[in-house]
Amino acid sequence: MNKEKLRALLAIPAVITVGWGFAVAGNSGRGMDWISSPFACAVLLAFCLQWVAFVPAYLGRTERYFDIVGSATYILATAMLLIRSEGLDTRSVILGLMIFIWALRLGSFLFVRIHKAGKDGRFDVIKNCFVRFLAAWTLQGLWITFTAAAAWTAIASNYKEPFGWYAAIGILIWLVGIAIEVVADRQKSQFKANPENKDKFIRVGLWSLSRHPNYFGEILLWSGVAVIAIPVLQGWQWIVLS
């Protein structure tokens, strides 16, 4: 077994362990019941959906549905939490809408992009290796959990606080973040569509100010989500902000 396969083989249980840790933290350290804990169910769903999608993806040696499955997972897990919530409040609804809007926008953008390109070069090698491809899908489950954990914890929490200044500031941060991400993605798409720019790195618009403004926008919008969630986090749940 080569080093890449060995790393992937070791990474899978490590990633699952970290995901389990997040599930425990989001449940405020009160032990673990995967059925009765909405947050734990969301984490479990995030991983299971990746593993289910991995099977046809590996059999077909395709990565075309990797991003769209990730986006759908955000939506399905968040919807499940909203449905299971014992008392929906304004904070939970807004957090849910933020995730829905972001996931639908980015998921559709990435899906169209990869179908135009025909492939995603990141997967050229690993999609032909069972262990490495499975590790990539498993890591996506953890990434979804990691980014959405603050929102999921707030939605699943029985502890509610009035919708105050934290939430207003968080919404503003989120709006700025998603605006930056949308503009950056559009500018890069327009740049790549010009044959004269083949093999060139974009340095116009927001890309003249930052090497990866789209990533900056995403970091910013998830930071806004975290700010909104902060007032209802308790005990071990603060770990989800890490």
Feature annotation, model-predicted:
Residues 33-48, 63-75:
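Loop-to-helix transition at the N-terminal end of transmembrane alpha-helices
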Residues 1, 5, 31, 35-39, ...:
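Hydrophobic, aromatic-rich alpha-helical transmembrane segments
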Residues 9-30, 46, 50, 74-106, ...:
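Hydrophobic transmembrane alpha-helices
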Residues 6, 36-41, 58-66, 208-213:
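Short, amphipathic, aromatic/basic-enriched membrane-interface segments that mark the entry/exit
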Residues 1-2, 25-34, 54-61:
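Short juxtamembrane and helix-loop transition motifs at transmembrane-helix boundaries
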Residues 51-63, 108-115:
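C-terminal ends of transmembrane helices
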Residues 62-76, 119-136, 200-207:
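Juxtamembrane helix-capping/reentrant segments at transmembrane boundaries
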Residues 103-151:
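Hydrophobic alpha-helical segments and helix pairs
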